[in-house]
Design a protein with these regions (language model features):
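Short, acidic, Ser/Thr-enriched surface-loop or helix-capping motifs
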Residues: 117, 189, 258
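A short, glycine/Asx- and small/polar-enriched loop/turn
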Residues: 85-88, 189, 239
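Short secondary-structure boundary segments
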Residues: 183, 249-251, 366-367
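Gly/Ser/Thr-rich active-site cleft segment
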Residues: 176-207
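Glycine/GP-enriched mid-protein hinge/lid loop-to-helix segment characteristic of carbohydrate kinases
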Residues: 125-127, 136-155, 202-203, 209-326
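ATP-binding/phosphotransfer module of carbohydrate and carboxylate kinases, centering on a glycine-rich
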Residues: 1-175, 286-289, 294-434
């Protein structure tokens, strides 16, 4: 006699205590608002800063005094009022002659250490391939048998060891205030931890602790997508300041979302995990198997590894993704065709994100969109075909403001974002102010 089937056990209802607390929203101090206004509009008179920020003239005068005391801004030459009448103005602007920030970015195949000034300009960078050693599931982007990457702590200590020489050769007497660190996948900025980076084989790596011990600098940690979205807010086009989606397409594919100027992190630091959006193969060839076991995921179709594999299938054998890009830039039709196919798939993903979030701007961080006009046109055309809410892709979908220096910008932008949010915070290299 058959037993009656046991009914499926219903999952216990989710309790509030089961959900990790979300990190605090980014709150810009009054002094931070003044510093950002000076960044955007300087050299600018204090009276204009008051109008730009909505703060009282007396408050602005106090904030500017603190910023001058910390050496973050400087005064320019006295100028007459706009009509030649009234009191003269002494404009203020960002002082780029005293301080720098350092940046570090870890990609799948290489790492980058950089220096940036307080206007977000890259002063110097040093990119090195990873040393091979401990095992890891995606040691290369070329599809060879993975031999693994250096362990997380060892790689981070190598980054720290490379920084002093960069400072010695390029700082020109300026003091480094802090180190910003960025990488892909899930990063918890409040804890300073890389929660999970499957391509590197990293899980719960205490980046801040390791780098602060190794460098003696304050260390700020975030995902590269959020870092680049913050860089767009600070130093990019004005249209990217308030409501932005940023889509990063490289060896890793992920995204960042900003609303009312604040980045959305998520309670598990997982906001922007778009790698497994199911998009299919774009109608050309079989879909690339994904690490998740499915086919047609966004990352498995458009990642650098997938691009190099597809090139080999077409008889175009290249040693790296960079070599494939060089071919496309030089006019190789097969290489260009691969980037145009990629642009269509990225456009399909962009259309989904536009319909989900309806941002003012969607920034695409992808070298084809940034350097190959045909690819940007194809991407925008695909958005026009597929998005229900985007009625002007030419205005809404834009390439990165940092094409050519994306990874060098990402790490430093983490530190600069923290500085512009709270310039009176605990910055040991800055003079104390009351």
């Amino acid at each position: 006699m058959k037993r009656p089937p046991v009914p499926a056990r219903r999952p216990a209802p989710l309790r509030r205590s089961d959900i990790p607390a979300a990190g605090p929203a980014r709150r810009v101090s009054g002094t931070g608002s003044v510093l950002s206004a000076i960044l955007d509009h300087g050299p600018v008179a204090r009276s204009n800063v008051a109008r730009l920020t909505g703060l009282s003239p007396a408050a602005v005068t106090g904030h500017v005094g603190q910023l001058l005391a910390r050496g973050l801004v400087r005064e320019g030459a006295e100028t007459a009022g706009p009509t030649g009448l009234g009191r003269p103005h002494i404009p203020v602007e960002i002082d780029t002659g005293r301080y720098l920030v350092a940046g570090a970015h870890v990609a799948v195949a290489h790492s980058t250490v950089s220096l940036m000034d307080l206007r977000g300009r890259v002063v110097a960078e040093d990119r090195q391939p990873h040393a091979l050693g401990a095992t890891g599931p995606y040691a290369t982007v070329l599809g060879r048998s993975p031999r693994g990457l250096s362990s997380g702590p060892a790689l981070l200590r190598d980054l720290a060891d490379r920084l002093p020489r960069l400072v010695e050769e390029h700082a020109a007497g300026r003091t480094v205030l802090a180190l910003g660190f960025a990488t892909g996948h899930r990063v918890d900025p409040a804890a300073g931890v890389v929660v999970e980076h499957p391509h590197l084989g990293w899980r719960d790596v205490p980046v801040r602790e390791i780098l602060e011990t190794a460098t003696g600098l304050p260390v700020h940690v975030d995902s590269h997508s959020r870092a680049l979205a913050r860089a767009e807010q600070l130093f990019g086009e004005a249209s990217t300041r308030v409501s932005t989606v940023l889509l990063f397409v490289g060896a890793v594919v992920d995204a960042a979302f900003a609303s009312s100027g604040n980045m959305h992190l998520g309670p598990r630091s997982g906001a922007g995990s778009v790698a497994h959006l199911p998009l299919g193969s774009g109608g050309s060839g079989g879909a690339e198997p994904c690490s998740c076991g499915r086919t047609g995921c966004l990352q498995s179709e458009v990642s650098e590894r997938a691009m190099v594999r597809r090139a080999a299938e077409q008889g175009l054998f290249v040693g790296s993704f960079a070599e494939l890009l060089d071919g496309a830039l030089a006019g190789d039709e097969r290489a260009l065709g691969l980037f145009r196919r990629r642009a269509l798939l990225v456009g399909r993903a962009a259309a989904l994100l536009l319909d989900m979030f309806d941002p003012e701007v969607l920034v695409v961080v992808e070298p084809g969109a940034g350097r190959l006009p045909e690819c940007l046109a194809d991407l925008r055309a695909e958005v026009a075909r597929r998005s229900w809410v985007c009625d002007d892709p030419e205005r809404t979908v834009v390439p990165s403001s940092f094409t050519g220096s994306v990874l060098a910008t990402a790490g430093g932008a983490v530190a600069l974002g923290a500085l512009y949010d709270d310039p009176l915070g605990p910055w040991p290299a800055l003079p104390a102010v009351s």
